[in-house]
Amino acid sequence: MQSSASRCGRALVALLLACGLLGVWGEKRGFPPAQATPSLLGTKEVMTPPTKTSWTRGSNSSLMRSSAPAEVTKGGRVAGVPPRSFPPPCQRKIEINKTFKYINTIVSCLVFVLGIIGNSTLLRIIYKNKCMRNGPNILIASLALGDLLHIIIDIPINAYKLLAGDWPFGAEMCKLVPFIQKASVGITVLSLCALSIDRYRAVASWSRIKGIGVPKWTAVEIVLIWVVSVVLAVPEAIGFDVITSDYKGKPLRVCMLNPFQKTAFMQFYKTAKDWWLFSFYFCLPLAITAIFYTLMTCEMLRKKSGMQIALNDHLKQRREVAKTVFCLVLVFALCWLPLHLSRILKLTLYDQSNPQRCELLSFLLVLDYIGINMASLNSCINPIALYLVSKRFKNCFKSCLCCWCQTFEEKQSLEEKQSCLKFKANDHGYDNFRSSNKYSSS
């Protein structure tokens, strides 16, 4: 288990370094990260289309400006613009190279392929294998299904949007894409919270061994997770719209959060969106995991002396599941931290009227690019983390991916035998433990 955990840690460190190097390379080349890949959290800033142009990042209601150089009068002021309308523009021009677009498209294709293979295989393992249909695994399947919807619908559209520059899909798809993105993130967050609570309940009731099947409360949890996630994603569908502006004499359509919302609620949502995303979609799962894993550790230490030998194998399995859930939460935190950090730093440190803002803006662009790519990786990395950490999932992945040529009956029989073997052994040990207790009490 330690070797698997260390391999998982090394893989995550390598992923962080690779994304960091790619982001720094894009900054040196002058690529704009915020537009390179559409933000999964719905960034409010707007980039100019993928051509060589100057770029200025403004407030929440900033819109695109023409890339033509501003005419400066003898007094040093921009012609036709009041002195206090805009801050002095950044002197540095940001260029979008075709090489960058192709590299980002390749990364999106890799995420698309790995995400479909990994998440669909994970769903197949849990669906076909009766012994894998328990509470925690059903929650993991719900998480994988949400990631799969995001991968199938959003990633191809975002990659095409980068290559095309203009938004060609209409207002309906402009509302659907951020809606699915937000719903997918909500399903991930709430599923991780439910898994953390479930692990504490399992350890707190360590003497009760559950059989095969999905508890009714787990089914209710999954329904609530999907309903709440969909409801919380509705403001994205309401607020996003296709904004048409003039760019070099041609109309340019951009899918973005409309800076001019019609209702008071949507205006408040636009203003408080970044803080809401950071608190609910990032801090909440980390806080719940920290609280319930602390309680779980205290419970295990308190009952360690009273645990019976007959239950050791079953407790080891529960500890393995707890480590697996903790690894999923850790992967989520590492993948989403750079993007949330970029948003919070912009809200707290970035001042549009500061003449020295361009240096901070350059750093935020690099961090934003790293965060967007790592957030996309979170949709395909969960099956990989399960493969590295959990022995049961690792064996099931191997048998599922390496036995495609077998008949359906052979594959089903092999999966059931492999996964049910340990469960039957543990159940037999628990029966012996109960019979010994009855004998001693009589």
From Swiss-Prot:
UniProt cross-references to PROSITE patterns, sorted A to Z: G_PROTEIN_RECEP_F1_1 (PS00237), G_PROTEIN_RECEP_F1_2 (PS50262)
Tissue: Widely distributed in cell types of a variety of tissues.
Residue numbers carrying Phosphotyrosine: 439
Disulfide topology: 174-255
Gene3D superfamilies hit by this protein: Rhodopsin 7-helix transmembrane proteins
InterPro entries listed in its UniProt record: Endthln_rcpt, ETB_rcpt, GPCR_endothelin_rcpt, GPCR_Rhodpsn, GPCR_Rhodpsn_7TM
Classification via SUPFAM superfamilies: Family A G protein-coupled receptor-like
Pfam families found in the cross-reference section: 7tm_1
Extracellular side: 27-101, 164-175, 244-271, 351-362
Topological type in the membrane: Multi-pass membrane protein
GO molecular function annotations of the record: endothelin receptor activity; G protein-coupled receptor activity; peptide hormone binding; type 1 angiotensin receptor binding
Cited CDD domains: 7tmA_ET-BR
Cytoplasmic side: 127-137, 198-218, 297-324, 390-442
Name assigned to this protein: Endothelin receptor type B
